[in-house]
Amino acid sequence: MAKIHFRTAQFLISAPSIRQCPTEEGTEVAFAGRSNAGKSSAINTLTGNGKLARTSKTPGRTQLINFFNFPAAPDQRIVDLPGYGYAKVPMAVKKKWQADLSEYLQQRDALRGLVIVMDIRHPLQDFDTMMINWAVEGEMPVHLLLTKADKLKPGAAKSTLLAVQKHMRDAQVDDLVSAQMFSALKKQGINQLEDVLNGWLLPQHDEPEAAQE
């Protein structure tokens, strides 16, 4: 089975809105999350490039949709969506982000899956749940990345993961929503995340005859 070499990721373009996004050839997966959840660190750990997704000491500052692709797979993309939900961001900006995120999720045909990044110590905040609901309503697969797992003892981290998975089962969305623990500091969970992303980005490679129809 073909696999993407995520460590070859390169910056493609920044877009201030969905209208400035690249053309929709190929497939893409998006990363979304609260501004202090560790989204940029997760992308940088996945790609082995500490400077690929910019981190800011002022959470919520980045308002661009950032696209990355791969030299050997230019039509497959990782998308870094603006962080959301930070208390110091003006309400007008929050509302614009909410509208932009909703528009992207609902109208972007190339999108194959959504990674929602959550601090394992504070999972399933209100806007996280809203993002899950948006995706599920559109039958979009979701992967919950519980970051900063190193901040909890192993038993507590595992209990949180199990609680999140149970919440998805109780909500009857576990067929679309998966979850895992992740630590950028300890490099934990990279292979599992890669498997999820490859499954989303390269499904057509598994069924070449169907893709030609």
Curated annotation (Swiss-Prot):
InterPro entries: G_ENGB_dom, GTP-bd, GTP-bd_ribosome_bio_YsxC, P-loop_NTPase. Residues 25-203 form the EngB-type G domain. It comes from the Bacteria. GO terms for molecular function: GTP binding; metal ion binding. Its cofactor is Mg(2+). GTP binds at residues 33-40, 60-64, 80-83, 147-150, 179-184. Mg(2+) binds at residues 40, 62. Belongs to the TRAFAC class TrmE-Era-EngA-EngB-Septin-like GTPase superfamily. EngB GTPase family. NCBIfam families: GTPase_YsxC. This is Probable GTP-binding protein EngB. It comes from Saccharophagus degradans (strain 2-40 / ATCC 43961 / DSM 17024).
